[in-house]
Amino acid sequence: MFRSFVKAAKGIYIHHELFLAEKKNPGVSVNVYKEYVFYRIKEINFPVIVKDTLGAGSIGVEIMNSYEEVESFLNSDQNNSDIMVEELIQGEQFGTEIHGVEGRYSVLPPIAFSVTKEGITDPLSSVKFGPVTDPSYHFEKVQEELLNMAQSLKFEGTVQVDLVYRAGEWYIIEINPRWSGMTTTTAAMEGRNPLSIFVDSILGTDKNYSMKRNLKYALNFKMKARSQEDLIRLYGNPHVDYIMQLETSVAGMEKINYCEVVIST
């Protein structure tokens, strides 16, 4: 699907129950699925990203630098759910969303993400800005491929896509067919309420949000949790579209409170 222009990071989805089949079923003497998983992992370039399939926004993501490190993790008690092992593509981090229903899709221009020194997005401190309009990225070709994908798979509502741009090439990192952590930002770019994305998908809209001329610039940033008085004062700014005070629980960490703000102009 993406071979003509957009590449995809090498990776493997590991089914937890199949990976541990010999431990739960005494009748299994040789776990060929586990052997296949390790064979595939050896073919991936390191470092890799290891993450479970239940989290969101890069929470719980680990970077591992060798095959031995991944093997040790998968054979340990830390491996307690389905896992993705994926090549870490170092480069500029972007995201986009697809909005609409069959026959009425908009593929938005990219939003740039800030990254950590490890080269990944930190969901608790990231900054997002878009749309990115530099023509040298040739993102219109990516939009065309994502539009074909949406039409083929008949997506409905919102679809979030993580991308990396490196050495003149685009890579698909992840596709999430749901409301995402950047949906409020894309809605601000479009100048509408996030829920309107779904209403307009059903009723139709005259605007094609794939076009930069139909979008505003939007910025999403995070800061420490604020008092109710501060939130009310902040929301009084005419450029502030959304404020979300959130409490996030991460396994092995204390609860984190932060405030997320989306502004547009």
Language-model region placement:
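Active-site nucleotide/adenylate-binding loops and adjacent lid/helix of ATP-dependent enzymes
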Residues: 5-90, 102, 129-148
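N-terminal glycine-rich "phosphate-gripper" loop used for MgATP/nucleotide binding
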Residues: 1
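Conserved hydrophobic "DFG−1" position in protein kinase catalytic cores
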Residues: 63, 98-100, 163-165
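Peripheral (often C-terminal) accessory segments that flank ATP-dependent C-N-forming ligase machineries
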Residues: 37-40, 199-265
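ATP-dependent carboxylate/phosphate-activation module, predominantly the ATP-grasp catalytic core
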Residues: 87-154, 176-202, 220
